[in-house]
Regions:
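Thiol/selenol-based redox catalytic cores and closely related redox-interacting motifs
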Residues: 34-114
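Local sequence-structure signature of Cys/Sec-based thiol-disulfide redox active-site neighborhoods
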Residues: 1-18, 22-23, 28-32
Length: 114
């Protein structure tokens, strides 16, 4: 079963859920606003795909926190991400050991077939 992490009212999440449903694929959705990742879960995500992939530098949270010109260590960025999980690029899809970040229907097709 695929796990989808994101925010319920996010357009990318809505599109992802619709794509999965139209493709007949079962999934479990985790709303990061209602069920934030634990430190350990976020560490696992970062370990598997890296902060650069996980952080949404185009989003509202990134802009509101004015992080663009700050020189932050990975530890500082991790803590900011843990405290501001709306800054996680969406969606995050997990299937077994595979993880996929961002909305990309072509990538979804390969991801669900593996």
């Amino acid at each position: 079963m695929i796990q989808v992490y994101g925010i319920k009212n996010c357009d990318k999440i809505r599109a992802t859920k619709k794509w999965l449903e139209n493709s007949g694929i079962d999934y479990t959705f985790y709303d990061l606003k209602k069920e934030p990742l634990t430190r350990e879960e976020l560490q696992e995500f970062v370990h598997r795909i890296g902060l650069d992939v996980l952080v949404n530098k185009r989003g509202t949270t990134w802009r509101n926190l004015k992080l663009k010109d700050k020189d932050l260590s990975d530890d500082e960025m991790f803590q900011i991400l843990l405290d501001n999980q709306t800054m996680i690029k969406r969606p995050v899809l997990i299937k077994d050991e595979a993880i996929l970040v961002g909305y990309d229907e072509e990538a979804f097709e390969g991801f669900v077939e593996d």
